[in-house]
Structures are given as C-alpha cells and as structure tokens.
Amino acid sequence: MSTAAATTPADRRALAWLLLAALLVLGAGIGLRDPWPSDEPRFALVAKTMVESGDWLFPRRGSELYPDKPPMLMWLQAASWLVVRDWRVAFLLPSLLAGLGTLVLVWDLARRLWSPRAGLLAAIGVLSALMFGFQFKRAQIDPLVTFEITLACYALARHLLLGPAWRWYWLGCFVAGLGVITKGVGVIALLMLLPYALARRAGWHGLAHTQGDGWRWALGVPAFLGAIALWLVPVAGVALARGTPEYLDYLRNILFDQTARRYAGQVGGHYGKGWWYFGPVLLLHFFPLSLAYGAAVRDAAAGWHARDGRLAVLLGWCALVLLFFTLAAGKREVYVLPMLPMLAVALAPTLLRIEQAAWLRRTALALAVAFGLGLVALAAWALSGRWARLQTVMLERGLHADELRPIFLWVAAAGAAFLLAAAVCRARRGVHALLAGLAAFWIVWGVGVAPRANASVTSAEVMLAADRIAGPDGEIVMVAWKEQNLLMSPRPLKDFGFRNEPAEQFERAVAWLREAPEQRWIFARQVAVQACVDAAHVTVAGQSNRRQWWMFRLDAVRPACRLPLRQPAEAAEDDGD
C-alpha cells in the first residue's frame, strides 16, 4: 500500500485554483440559456412537474408517466429549483456540482496513491478532456452517474488499495446502488472487485489484505441493494397497490425494458457499431489526456513487472468497463465517460513524468496554434458569406441571418484566445497554452455562443407565438409534440400522451376541438399532420430545430381523414430527439 506525502498549504492552494478554474469553465453560461434538446427539456419538464404537482415518486411527461429513466436527476433539479427559484440555473446545477465533486475525488485519490502533484495533474487531465467539458456543461444524467461511479470507485479504492477500511467499502457498494437508480450502469463501479481479487490472488503489491472477514465482504450486498430499495420499494409498492395498467406498465418498462433493451441496442437507434467503436472515442473525446497514452504504455509495463496492485486495479477496472460497453450492441460515445476519472488516476504517474517533456510542450503548443487558426479561419469563412452550406444549415435550424454574425464573432474570439495563449506561453509552457485555450473555448461557448443560439434551439419563441395566436380565452392541445413545447409554454396545455402515435393523438384532439370549435386550437408539428390539414386555414406558429409548428382550429381539419402510422425509423428518430 502507498503512503502519499501529506498535502502542504501550497498543494491546497493549487486545488483551490483548479476548482476556481473548473467553476469558470463548467459554470460559464449557467442562467443564460434554456434546456436544449434532446434530453435537457424532458428532464427539466419532469422536474418542473414534480414541483408543481407535489408528486416526486412517479415522474410525469405531460399527462403520462415517464418511464425512460429513474428520477434521481429530476429530483436534484427540482430540489435545486427550491433553492435558487430559477429554472435556467436549477436545471444545470446538478451537473456543475457533479463536475466539481468528480475533480475533488480524482485529486484526492491520486494524491493518496501517488503524490499531491500527481493528484493535481490527474484532476487537470479530467477537467481539460473534451468530453468532460461538453457533458458536464449539459443537464444530462451522464454527469451525475459519472460522479456517483467515481465516488463509488474512490470509496472502494480507499479500502482495496489504501485499507483495509470497511466503512469505505460499504459506502462504495451503497453509492454503486445509488448509481443504479440514477442510470442502470451505475453497477459497473463494482467491477473493481474483480481485478483486485485476481491481483491479490497473484500476490501483487499495494493491496489491502484481510483474513476471516467474509461476513464483512458480504455486507456489501445489502449496502448495494439497500440503496436501490430506497427508490424501488416505495415505487413498486405504490404501483402494485394502485394496480392500474398505467402504473404496472411504468414498473415493467423502467425495471426491465429500458436498461436491457438499451444494452441490446433496441432503444435509441445506437446499434450496429463495431467492436472498435470506442477506440477513436478514447483518443479524441478524452483529448488532451490521450496525449499521455503512448508514454503510459512504458509505465504500465513497469508496473506489471513490479507487480503494482494499484495499476492492476485501476487499469483492470477501466478495461472491464470498456469491455462491458464494447460487448453491448447499443453504443454511444458518452457511455465511456465514467472511465475518464479512474483512467486519469491511473495515468497520474505518467503525467508527473512527462509534465516537463519537451515533446509534450512542443506538441501542445502546436495544437494550440492549430486550434486557434482553425477557429479564426472558420469564423472568417462564415462571416465572408462564402460558406453557403453552413449558413443554409444554420438558417434551417432557425437562426436568423443577423444572429449568425455575433455567433461567429464569438467563434473568432475563441480562436484568438488560443493564439494569444500560445504567444504568451510559447514552447516553454506549451501545455499551459493548450489548457488556457481550451478553458477560454468553453467559457466563450457558455457566455457567447449558447445564449445567442438559444432562441433557435429552444421553442421559447414558438410557444410565445402560439400563446398569442390562441388569445387569452383560447385553449390549446398538442399533437406530435416535444417536451420543450410544454416546458416553454407560458400557459397550461392539454395533451393526449407523448408516446401515443400522432394519428391517435390527432384523432382524439379533433374530437376535443368539436366540443368548443371557436375556442380550441391544435398545436402540431407540420410534417406529422399536414396530410389531414388544409394549409390555407393554418396559422404558422414558427420554426425551431428544423421543425415547423402549426396552429389551427376545426375548420382546417379535412373531414374523415386519418393520419398514417409512423414508420419504425420515424418513431426512433422522434424518441431520440
């Protein structure tokens, strides 16, 4: 077992500066934008409904139960709103706190296993990784479950590598259970026990040794299951007690269909990707930490010959996680995000060794210059009007021509930040130049680009227009709707389910219109209803995310017309965005 040097005031100051930088990078833009598709609006809508209805046990999406994910993230978003009273802040707050917590855990574990400096470098490696910045600036479940898996691995490592410390082991099992009720894959933290058992059996060094403690190991099972039971027991009890098809279907869907079918690639359309799929992800999405991969091979080989149990457990766990997701038919880049923190801890000795390497400094400086020139060139090309295809795509997404210029000016500013950092730091501090440029990029994205793209990415303007069209006494029902429509609406809206076929929604909505044809309106996606609607009697509410939205009353509906059912590909696309 390793005994790391005690931290000094200078080490703690370095951590404080790192967390301040992380707060700027991850927090820049919080409060300046609304939830963006595809997942952010649905989670924020569920959280908002929890607060308004008082029902926190069964999440709802409009009038129907939402069975796709356990409600852990939505609970935290709703709780955040109770504190800050601003949904633009509350929906992103759990991701921000999860990011800061992940960095502290990486720093502390690497500090204890290697040295305070190694801990700082490992945390910097995590913060600077492209996937970390991209994901932890969004309100997705993945940042939260990554924090929980990291906390579980941290607690297990405190026992397996720095112990014995049974309370840490039990805590790790408990947090892994919390990860399961956040997103089913939280269980992967417990895979750390397998390389530990193999390395201990082989007599490797740096591992906790216990004897006659089988009952203590066994207590990890109730700790794990107990965390799951905190949510599962009340949910199952209430659902079975109510016994309605809606609640029984919710229970079946969330317990069996979602996790198993997603792993098998039958939900979300992320199937058909080869075994090699995660290779480029680990290289590109974990950049710039991936610059250390080549040098880490030498350290891993040295650790193997030295029978270093620390590397065996950490790298063994990473390999098992990678194998787990590689074997799955359904694959997405973000699935390997939970690997990043422990991979950085395992690479900490390598980062410490190559920190001042000339090749790394020169490479980092060259990359900073390349990124800067690339962003400036992109902005200049777009602003010159010569890149017609790019402008066409952005206009299709609802961005007005007068909005493109400030967005690309911010892109140019991000490129200039890379170049300025390279000019100031030069080759002697090339790594600093690259890190500073990446930090500036995320800050510019948060405070410059995202707020200006917000109106086109969200349905805020469309829903305000729909509200004006209906008038103060009008009522609106949604057909073929998206979560952001209900979330951004300034008035209550009616729906006939989200997962129901648009044809069924439309049929029921038309019957509802007939009850008060002068007062009631249908708000619908154009492509979903145009076969049965006379466009001459339609009022266009607007366009967002390349979708046009219509408002119409009963006089626009073609008599005896029935909408066709969606094709499977169309249904998968609708479910995924």
Which functions belong to the PLM regions below?
Residues 1-26, 216-224:
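Start-transfer (signal-anchor) and selected internal transmembrane alpha helices
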Residues 2-7, 166, 170, 263, ...:
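Membrane-embedded architecture of ER/inner-membrane glycosylation machinery
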Residues 24-29, 42-65, 72, 79, ...:
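Extracytosolic helix-loop segments that constitute the early lumenal/periplasmic catalytic or substrate-binding loops
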Residues 92-95, 134-145:
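Short acidic/glycine- and proline-prone juxtamembrane loop motifs at membrane-interface regions
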Residues 93-113, 151:
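Transmembrane-helix motifs of polytopic, lipid-linked glycan transferases
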